[in-house]
Amino acid sequence: MIQTTEINRPPAAVAQAIAPLLSVRNIEVVYDDVILVLRGLSLEVPQGTIVALLGANGAGKSTTLKAISGLLKTEDGEVTRGEIVFDGERINGIDPDKIVRRGIIQVMEGRRIISDMTSLENLRLGAFTRGDNEVGADIDMVFNYFPRLKERTGLAGYLSGGEQQMLAIGRARS
């Protein structure tokens, strides 16, 4: 069973007036067309809050995140019931790259930064299918969002663990 905990919860009156940024409504996830792994899962993430998914191994935390990110198909999984709504728009069934463009990014543990490449090269690697003009603005946004990544041309292997995680998040976004 997945437990959610809200941090920085807004006052009840404010929370009711604001539609949730992310809403997972009664989803069911099935792998290989027969293995039911989630049933009736619902959660809401109000704008400006942090929600933690807590649970034992095998409780469905990663599956929930993969469902939200659109990554279930890579493991023969699918959301067979319910809906996932982000910023007022239903996103289940949408390709993962389009979900990223809408602002949902999943970066798992294990940063997989290429240490012999620069920060800039690592970011460009995440956007290898896109044109330079389109990628440039996204890369600038990453460096603005993470000011600790001020050195674009330094080797990523010399970054701290936290900076490498920032770089991994930026690469997923670019």
Where are these regions (language model features)?
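Conserved ABC nucleotide-binding domain
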Residues: 91-94, 142-158, 174
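Short beta-strand immediately N-terminal to the Walker A/P-loop
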Residues: 51-52, 106
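Helix-to-loop junction immediately C-terminal to a conserved catalytic motif
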Residues: 69
